[in-house]
Regions:
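Short flexible/disordered coil segments
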Residues: 1-4, 28-34, 80-82, 126-127
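Short charge-dense sequence patches
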Residues: 1-7, 39-50
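Extreme N-terminal tail/first-helix region
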Residues: 1-16, 70
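Residues at structural and domain junctions
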Residues: 3, 10, 40, 78-82, ...
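Short helix-to-loop capping/linker segments positioned immediately adjacent to catalytic or ligand/cofactor-binding
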Residues: 4, 19-23, 107-113
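Generic detection of intrinsically disordered/low-complexity segments and helix-coil linkers/edges
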Residues: 8, 20, 26-27, 34, ...
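Short beta-strand segments
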Residues: 12-46, 62-64, 74-76
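Short, structured beta-strand-loop surface elements
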Residues: 47-122, 126-127
Length: 127
């Protein structure tokens, strides 16, 4: 990605995050994301399919999209990693809270309330 493409991507509220299945097919999911030091961070339920797929295939791709997943930009090839270290997870959470503010804090509140906060997975995406 060049700097103009990066700027357009980072202005978006959502990206379509595509992970690869064993069959080679791609599964697209609209997600919140936050930039930090050249990487992008997302979160998901720990048992979600995208998390399981990333354990097998680090290849991924991202594109800007609407909240409902309708693509609004081009695909970019990336590599993604599930973050297992608490320090790395805190970096991801801080980046997401910085970008989404009260919305992320509200999501955190309900995740704690329902017991899902501890089962969250944080993912780093490297362009």
């Amino acid at each position: 990605m060049n700097s103009d493409e990066t700027e357009i991507l980072e202005r978006s509220d959502y990206i379509s995050f595509a992970t690869r299945k064993r069959s080679g097919d791609w599964v697209n999911t609209p997600v919140w994301f936050a930039p930090d030091e050249g990487s992008y961070y997302v979160f998901s339920a720990g048992e979600a399919g995208k998390v399981k797929r990333l354990r097998n295939f680090r290849e991924s791709r991202i594109a800007t999209c609407t909240m409902n997943g309708k693509l609004t930009g081009d695909w970019y090839d990336t590599h993604a990693y599930v973050l297992d270290e608490p320090r790395d997870q805190q970096i991801a959470l801080a980046a997401l809270r910085k970008k989404y503010g009260w919305q992320m804090r509200l999501a955190d509140f309900f995740s704690r309330l329902t017991g899902k906060m501890g089962r969250r997975a944080y993912i780093r995406i490297d362009p």
